[in-house]
Design a protein with these regions (language model features):
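One face of beta-strands
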Residues: 150-152, 165, 177-179, 211-213, ...
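Low-complexity or membrane-interfacial segments used for flexible interactions
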Residues: 2-107, 184-312
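Long, contiguous regulatory modules within eukaryotic nuclear regulatory proteins
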Residues: 170, 178-183
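Short strand-coil-strand connectors
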Residues: 155-157, 182-186
Length: 312
């Protein structure tokens, strides 16, 4: 900043002043007049404050980042599934192991085991793989008959200050294979993906995706006019491809294992709820796999009955 300094000599005279009141005029004095030059933005030594639009755009960016699916936990579910050509008998009650997946994509040690005690029952329970006592983290109970959806029960001994909770896995409708779960953590839905979603998953996985199940968190938000709008956020996906499905199973196998990817960022600072969400995702994913096996067995039974009755 440059300044211009001038020296001025000033003499004051009083107009119409009474000489008796002011006997002597005031003395002459000198003053400096300083003219400030215009400050250019480039010459300022301080950083200017950010514009409002910059702050607003940054806020939008941070909000949209949470809507992008980013897996914070990956698990490999190993299950042989049910082949296309076989008798519609109940599968063997072999335990389903769920393994941790490292940051490099390598499979680590087992984290959970889903145990089905009896072959003629679909009910099962989930335990820690290293728990010799096999204390259930949650149990899934299947009931026979229409209008009786399976229930997942989160056991109260797993989490501090938490009562047991029963969660129904309800079908969304007759013409869809999607299911809905209403919990204290929110409302969640398992559904089968669209072709566009499979192509997007193929880009991230690096190979063709045979089957993709998506776990959505469903929320109701208020909009203008006093109405409510449904919003969805993907919190999980179950990917089955040539490299991720259980070894020995095929593309046409029903209920085979694959890679479960979970986005648990919303619950990172709430340890108990994060663990509850992880267990719920694993148990409900295994339930979706069983649903595929039941569907395959039903189709096989219908085919056998049609052939025995001499159908067209």
């Amino acid at each position: 900043m440059s300044t211009k300094v001038e020296t001025m000599s000033t003499s004051l005279s009083y107009l119409n002043s009474d000489s008796s009141t002011y006997s002597n005029p005031p003395p002459e004095y000198e003053a400096e007049a300083i003219e400030l030059s215009r400050i250019s933005p480039a010459s300022s030594s301080t950083n200017s404050l950010p514009e409002y639009t910059t702050l607003y755009n940054n806020n939008i960016t941070s909000t949209s980042d949470t809507e992008v699916f980013y897996p914070t936990k990956q698990l490999q579910i190993q299950a042989p599934g049910f082949p296309l050509i076989s008798l519609p008998l109940p599968p063997q009650p072999d335990p389903i192991y769920i393994f941790n997946v490292g940051s490099t994509g390598d499979i680590d040690e087992a984290e959970y085991v889903s145990i089905r005690p009896a072959r003629n029952s679909g009910s099962c329970f989930l335990v820690r793989a290293n728990d010799q006592v096999q204390k259930p983290l949650c149990t899934t109970t299947y009931r026979f008959g229409p209008g009786k959806p399976p229930k997942i029960r989160l056991e109260n001994g797993t989490f501090q200050n938490r009562q047991s909770e029963e969660i129904e896995i309800s079908c969304k409708g007759v013409f869809t294979r999607g299911v809905v779960m209403r919990t204290h953590l929110g409302t969640f839905e398992w559904r089968y993906s669209s072709r566009a979603e499979r192509r997007a998953a193929q880009t991230s996985v690096g190979e063709e995706v045979d089957c993709l199940l998506i776990l959505d968190q469903v929320m109701k938000v208020a909009v203008a006019g006093g109405k409510q709008e449904e919003r969805r956020r993907k919190v999980g996906q179950f990917v089955r491809s040539n490299g991720l499905r259980t070894p020995g199973s095929r593309k046409c196998t029903a209920g085979n294992g694959g890679r479960l990817m979970l986005d648990l960022r919303e619950w990172l600072d709430r340890k108990d709820e994060r663990l509850e969400m992880e267990i719920l995702a694993v148990a409900s994913c295994v339930s979706m796999m069983k649903k595929e096996v039941d569907r395959r067995r039903m189709h096989q039974t219908m085919a056998i009955m049609g052939g025995a009755s001499g159908g067209p």
